[in-house]
């Protein structure tokens, strides 16, 4: 049976607790849009799923920010000179793993986080754009106005 390192267990427990109890407001990623019509209907069949996905993404970003901060700002833990159940190469592997984790945390902070937030922003902007064009598209379909429909779809694409 393979033993799981205590540090891995501690980090996993920390991330689980952080993501379970840390709540980031959904308003950070999505602004609620109120409809002016009096009907109680949803424009998006997956509106609740979208809200849940955005909320989960917000929790993920928060957890990754905290984790990367800890990795970058905490010193290396060294077990050099300690024999760990016959695993003589384990201390050097731990040091290398810490260096790799720190490099990944820097990559998260400098590249990945921005790409993720840009993607989430793009999704929200498209959703808003779609909601703004929805009534016009439905009306164009119902009246058979092909030109308006083409223009609306073209606007959504660009």
Curated annotation (Swiss-Prot):
The protein's name: Uncharacterized protein in hblA 3'region
Superkingdom classification of source: Bacteria
Annotated compartments: Cell membrane
Statement: the UniProt record of this protein carries the keyword Hydrolase: no
Transmembrane segments: 120-140
Signal peptide (UniProt feature, chain positions): 1-22
Keywords: Cell membrane, Membrane, Signal, Transmembrane, Transmembrane helix
Chief location: membrane
Membrane is among the record's keywords: yes
Organism listed in the record: Bacillus cereus
InterPro entries with a match to the protein in the record: Enterotoxin_cmpnt, HBL
């Amino acid at each position: 049976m393979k033993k799981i390192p205590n540090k891995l267990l501690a980090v996993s427990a920390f991330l689980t607790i952080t993501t379970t109890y840390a709540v980031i407001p959904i308003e950070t990623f999505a602004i609620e849009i109120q409809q002016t019509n009096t009907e109680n209907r949803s424009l998006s069949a997956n509106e609740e799923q979208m809200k849940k996905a955005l909320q989960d993404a917000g929790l993920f970003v928060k957890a990754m920010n905290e984790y990367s901060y800890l990795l970058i700002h905490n010193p290396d833990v060294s077990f050099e000179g300690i024999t760990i159940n016959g695993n003589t190469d384990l201390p050097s592997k731990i040091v290398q793993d810490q260096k790799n984790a720190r490099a990944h945390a820097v990559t998260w902070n400098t590249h990945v986080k921005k790409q993720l937030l840009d993607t989430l922003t793009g999704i929200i902007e498209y959703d808003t754009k779609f909601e703004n064009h929805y009534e016009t598209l439905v009306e164009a379909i119902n009246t058979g106005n092909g030109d308006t429909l083409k223009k609306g779809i073209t606007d959504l694409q660009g």
